[in-house]
Amino acid sequence: MPGKRGLGWWWARLPLCLLLSLYGPWMPSSLGKPKGHPHMNSIRIDGDITLGGLFPVHGRGSEGKPCGELKKEKGIHRLEAMLFALDRINNDPDLLPNITLGARILDTCSRDTHALEQSLTFVQALIEKDGTEVRCGSGGPPIITKPERVVGVIGASGSSVSIMVANILRLFKIPQISYASTAPDLSDNSRYDFFSRVVPSDTYQAQAMVDIVRALKWNYVSTVASEGSYGESGVEAFIQKSREDGGVCIAQSVKIPREPKAGEFDKIIRRLLETSNARAVIIFANEDDIRRVLEAARRANQTGHFFWMGSDSWGSKIAPVLHLEEVAEGAVTILPKRMSVRGFDRYFSSRTLDNNRRNIWFAEFWEDNFHCKLSRHALKKGSHVKKCTNRERIGQDSAYEQEGKVQFVIDAVYAMGHALHAMHRDLCPGRVGLCPRMDPVDGTQLLKYIRNVNFSGIAGNPVTFNENGDAPGRYDIYQYQLRNDSAEYKVIGSWTDHLHLRIERMHWPGSGQQLPRSICSLPCQPGERKKTVKGMPCCWHCEPCTGYQYQVDRYTCKTCPYDMRPTENRTGCRPIPIIKLEWGSPWAVLPLFLAVVGIAATLFVVITFVRYNDTPIVKASGRELSYVLLAGIFLCYATTFLMIAEPDLGTCSLRRIFLGLGMSISYAALLTKTNRIYRIFEQGKRSVSAPRFISPASQLAITFSLISLQLLGICVWFVVDPSHSVVDFQDQRTLDPRFARGVLKCDISDLSLICLLGYSMLLMVTCTVYAIKTRGVPETFNEAKPIGFTMYTTCIVWLAFIPIFFGTSQSADKLYIQTTTLTVSVSLSASVSLGMLYMPKVYIILFHPEQNVPKRKRSLKAVVTAATMSNKFTQKGNFRPNGEAKSELCENLEAPALATKQTYVTYTNHAI
């Protein structure tokens, strides 16, 4: 009794009492209808125990109206499901025998504030107004119908409505079982401790949707949520699960206002299009908002652009997609696993205006369902609306499909019935009807029995609750498909703790069975690394591995080892090809040709000289140094073969030895010759005595001394840096690794080559200087001028060699150009010496043997006279062949010399 309540109990309910006092004047009158008759805003069915019911019979009103248009499926179907379940329980002798369940069913109008006002009816009996002192004008007591005591509530539908109602019901310890509210917030047992539901929490639904997104290989999606607990909590759960599982990023997260302004949905579509790659849109919204989003997408000409994924509020409903089939095509929706209740189909199809008077909204449903009017006064002139005949039948004269939550409404009512049955069995054992311990029913005790129920639902599914009052997660997955101008929701999979998705049964607009893309960035190609966008792990830029880098993993490029280059797709490394100058290379043709011809010519000259070794012209050329010079020329030509041969230890050692040795031998011999001529000529200017070291033995000694310096340098080089072959990967390490080559070569650097040839060049320059100094020697004094011409030409060859050789050091064909240039230059130098010094002699020997005769002896005195008096007889000598003026001079001077018997050295046959 109120008088026995504690002070704390009343203090906690003081705000509610004040609220009820405002409604007090109207509520008794509204509840004072005769038994069994409906109210204008609720259904009342009498029984021993009364259950409350909350259903969205109407949608949200506009322009200040609390209620809008009738909801045939979400409202009437579900409401009738509760009435159907009550009838079954009341007629079941094994469930609550001799106890009748009554009901008080209210319309929430899909609005939480309106539902709050309506739900005050459920607690009115708990806060009774003492009317003993109230008297009517006649002095009698007022006629007030005592409100029924509601022991439990079935509903509500929307999560925001359930949350609002749960906050009141928990104060009065009235258990509540929802058939459709799935917001994760309602799992908070500390705030909504008297709330339970036969549908799974959106936490499970969010996990299922994340699994679907991943299975479809989408990683960049947008979310749309209706303002309120259901939409916002659902999207929040989806985002949380996507972060936990990874691999899914949110492009846009849009919230639909509770009272959207004009153009709000067009703005939402424009915002979704800002991230056009995110074609998948996750929708946690009520069906009205879903429909308006689809309409806005059609207005924006985005039919087929978005791929919708709807939560259970969309499910398999027709209303959200009616006349929007093309926009909604391909939509993937999720719905708690359910089965059609055939008994309900028979029940609902049999409802008529005559046998269903307890449903105060059934007449309105009848008019809306059959497009007719019950009253003639409601018919407008000129209207095509007909008058209802009451002979219309559901399913025959109108389309009918069982609403998706009917099963759960029935299961919720049965859960309450089973809990009351177990409670009656324990508290009233053996008693028929209610016992004092259940009159009134204690809500806290009833809640414990509700949480412990375990039975098979109307469709054979198990009905249980966990400690938070949630049902286990079991979902069916649908896709809205258009086939042959007909649209249907087709089951494509299920989810019970993990996903079972039949992708082959899916069909997408424009692409058939090919999975559409909803990704932030396209996958990187092989050889590219991902550079993720900060804060968006699903978005990245693809950066190619450059240069000699290869792809180690998705995020890393690494440089290949120095002797390797990346593969074509840059996913690994492969050895760099090793090149060398091949015998058949075009670069080797000219050097080999010159070398072969030169060696042949050299051997021919040697053979000729050996054959005619004792002839005057061979003797006059200085046989000893001539053969040394020919040996040097031969080595110059032979060096070409060493330069083209494959580099190895032996080849590289021979290159070091013979590359400069052939030239050193040649120029040492020529230098010795020019130096001998110069010394004889200069000595003749000063005295008639012979210069020292002009004998053949001395000349050979000088030549070999000069050559030994070259050999000594080579020996020191071998000791300091032993010869070996190397593969140079830097020489042709091009910017494009496809053209990179390793060059197999000897360890002779450019600096080493300069040092190797430097001594030969020094001999060549010195020889050239002597050739210039002896340019005035008479032609009869052997080879002074031919040697001069040889050295001038050789200098020109090597001056051309230097810029070509060192100017191509950065060329990709450096190996070929430098080797060819070096070998050709050496061969040309040898050819110049061979051609200018020996070919004229060979020509005379072979073709003009008559000229190969001894000349008259010339004395040193003649040489001296020629050196001192040559200018005097220059003009005369120019008119006489072979220096006859000088001969005459010598002959004129010979007689006095004999008379005085002066001693002098005589040279025979011009062997100077």
UniProtKB/Swiss-Prot annotation:
Residues 1-32 form the signal peptide. PROSITE patterns: G_PROTEIN_RECEP_F3_1, G_PROTEIN_RECEP_F3_2, G_PROTEIN_RECEP_F3_3, G_PROTEIN_RECEP_F3_4. One of its GO terms (molecular function) is glutamate receptor activity. Residues 33-587, 646-656, 721-750, 809-821 are extracellular. It is a multi-pass membrane protein. One of its GO terms (biological process) is regulation of neuron apoptotic process. It is found in: Cell membrane. Gene3D superfamilies: 3.40.50.2300, GPCR, family 3, nine cysteines domain. The chain crosses the membrane at residues 588-610, 625-645, 657-675, 700-720, 751-772, 786-808, 822-847. Glycans are attached at N98, N301, N454, N484, N569. Keywords: Cell membrane, Disulfide bond, G-protein coupled receptor, Glycoprotein, Membrane, Receptor, Signal, Transducer, Transmembrane, Transmembrane helix. Pfam families: 7tm_3 (PF00003), ANF_receptor (PF01094), NCD3G (PF07562). Residues 611-624, 676-699, 773-785, 848-912 are cytoplasmic. Interacts with PICK1. G-protein coupled receptor for glutamate. Ligand binding causes a conformation change that triggers signaling via guanine nucleotide-binding proteins (G proteins) and modulates the activity of down-stream effectors. Signaling inhibits adenylate cyclase activity. PANTHER family: METABOTROPIC GLUTAMATE RECEPTOR. This is Metabotropic glutamate receptor 4. The gene is GRM4.
